[in-house]
Design a protein with these regions (language model features):
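N-terminal localization/anchoring segments of enzymes in phospholipid and broader phosphate metabolism
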Residues: 1-341, 345, 349, 389, ...
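Helical hairpin unit composed of two closely spaced alpha helices linked by a short loop
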Residues: 350, 360-382, 386-387, 391
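Thr-Gly-centered strand-to-loop micro-motif
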Residues: 356-358, 415, 434-435
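Histidine/acidic-residue-rich catalytic or RNA/ligand-binding cores of hydrolases
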Residues: 365-368, 395-397, 426-427, 445
Length: 503
């Protein structure tokens, strides 16, 4: 093989004397060029480490990046500019300015809630802090339907789209060009041709299949399709932080769907290379829907600079249910680390039970400490993780937490019946959340997420029964299992833990 390559190069240089002269010039100056490359790489590493010290949020992260940037800059400098920037200040400032255009609508929604007597005062501890973080209010008069797995979820979403009379809002991180994506497209095209306004927002990095040519049928039917970018141009595809990880569908401002499922065949368990897919979504009706709509409006305005005319008249659910719920959109442009503080508050509020399910479990030290303190208070703390995963690095990192959690009595389980992707918490038989946020740094600080929080004993009971079945379909994991593994596996686990801030 190498001989063939040598012959090809020889023939090429024979035909192109200028290239041959250039190659000879490079060979003669190889040592000097390598020296200059070495100097340039380390200078770039030193300058980038100054930026890392100024911008990385934690001391541990700043130290890790500084060491890497100054010792192996050839790898770490490009890695930092792709993964490491947790404060893209220009974007954050622009995003906050953009929110000013939608703030009056947001405020009017909150005023309408109060005027209609739809604001709730849940007995859940620290609810005021949650409302201030969310910039939303807990509302009464909602109903919720728990949707377990993809078939139930997309059946519900497609039925809801069929019933739309005014508009449909669709926002997903991933939309595939497969059977499921095609079915969604068909239904949206059909509604648009009936005169219903249809808006679709997708993340450009999460949905690389959706090139402009594949969107022609949607646009020809009158569907307004936009992509979510953090920067303009080709550079956006290299910006892996600040992605829009939300999964939202809203119909007529009266019904919304939120949860862990993207649009694709694998999310319905139809990809033989992945197998069964375990996930959770929720359908809500009532005044909380317009809180979800606020999040969509803000994202849409960022992507299009358009303010949509939507229904902002909050009404109780037609079912007559009075569930208390709150919509919590979070993202890197928030003035506080909203997602981090929300889940820390939830952990600290637990007095009896704290069960959480997350496909990506890479908590930082403050979350590990909060979970340990909850267990020491006598709270039944359980963590449900996938056994089969689509991210080996995250799975390796997850092993590193077993000893810290087990020593205080926290029980860790790995789900056995397929790939588990749900993002669910259950607290004290009253409070539960379903949404898009994983238990990792990327969801807590770097991505746009949305979580639906419920303070309702009956609905929390449904979530409890669902999780009890999931725990029954899982196996307990002990720290001894890691100790019994070989040295190189344990070494890989520790190395993966070092990369937790960028996972």
């Amino acid at each position: 093989m190498f001989e063939k390559v040598r012959q090809l190069l020889s023939r090429y240089f024979d035909r192109h004397p200028a290239a041959k002269r250039t190659a000879g010039w490079l060979r003669k100056r190889k040592r000097r060029l390598l020296t200059w490359f070495f100097i340039f790489a380390h200078l770039a590493g030193a300058l980038t480490s100054v930026r890392a010290i100024m911008e990385v949020r934690t001391a541990q992260g700043a130290i890790a990046w500084t060491v890497a940037l100054n010792t192996v800059p050839y790898v770490s400098v490009p890695a930092y500019w792709i993964f490491g920037r947790s404060k893209f200040q220009g974007y954050v400032i622009a995003r906050r300015k953009d929110l000013a255009h939608t703030s009056s609508i947001h405020l009017q929604y909150l005023v309408n809630l109060t005027n209609r007597g739809l604001v709730a005062n849940p007995t859940l501890g620290h609810s005021l802090a949650v409302e201030r973080l969310a910039r939303m209010r807990f509302t009464r008069g909602n109903d919720a339907e728990l949707l377990v797995d993809g078939d139930a979820t997309f059946k519900s979403i497609f039925e809801g789209i069929e019933q739309a009379k005014e508009y449909v809002l669709v926002e997903f991180y991933i939309i595939r060009k497969d059977n499921t994506g095609g079915e969604l497209k068909r239904r949206l095209v059909e509604k648009a041709r009936q005169g219903v306004r249809v808006y679709v927002l997708y993340d450009e990095v999460g949905s690389p299949d959706l090139i402009e040519s594949s969107l022609t049928e949607l646009r020809d039917a009158g569907v307004d399709v936009r992509r979510f970018n953090t920067t303009q141009g080709r550079a956006n595809r290299w910006q892996l932080n600040f992605r829009n990880h939300r999964k939202i569908v809203v119909v007529d401002g009266q019904t919304a769907w939120i949860g862990g499922l993207n649009v694709g065949d694998e999310y319905l368990g139809r990809d033989p290379t992945i197998g069964a897919w375990r996930d959770t979504h929720v359908k809500v009706t009532g005044p909380v829907v317009q809180g979800v709509q606020v999040a969509f409006l803000e994202d849409w305005h960022w992507a299009s600079q358009q303010l949509l005319k939507l229904n902002w008249d909050p009404q109780p659910s037609p079912s007559g249910a009075r569930r208390v719920a709150l919509s919590l959109p979070t993202g890197p442009a928030d003035s506080l680390e909203t997602c981090t503080l929300f889940f820390l508050n939830a952990i600290n509020a637990a007095t009896n039970r704290l069960w959480l399910a997350s496909p990506y479990f890479v908590p930082d030290e403050q979350f590990v400490s909060a979970l340990q303190l909850a267990a020491l208070r006598g709270v039944d703390v359980r963590v449900l993780l996938p056994d089969k995963t689509d991210n080996k690095l995250v799975q390796l990192s997850g092993w590193s937490y077993l000893d810290e959690l087990e020593k205080v009595g926290i029980k860790v389980y790995r789900y056995q019946k397929g790939l588990m992707h749900q993002k669910v918490t259950f607290i004290d038989d009253l409070y539960c959340t379903i949404g898009t946020a994983n238990f990792d740094n990327r969801s807590f600080r770097l991505n746009f997420e949305i979580t639906m929080a419920f303070a309702d004993a009956e609905f929390a009971g449904q979530v409890r029964r669902m999780l009890e079945q999931d725990f029954a379909d899982a196996k307990p994991v002990k720290a001894q299992e890691l100790k019994d593994r070989g040295f190189w596996f344990r070494f890989s686990v520790r190395c993966a833990r070092l990369m937790a801030p960028i996972q």
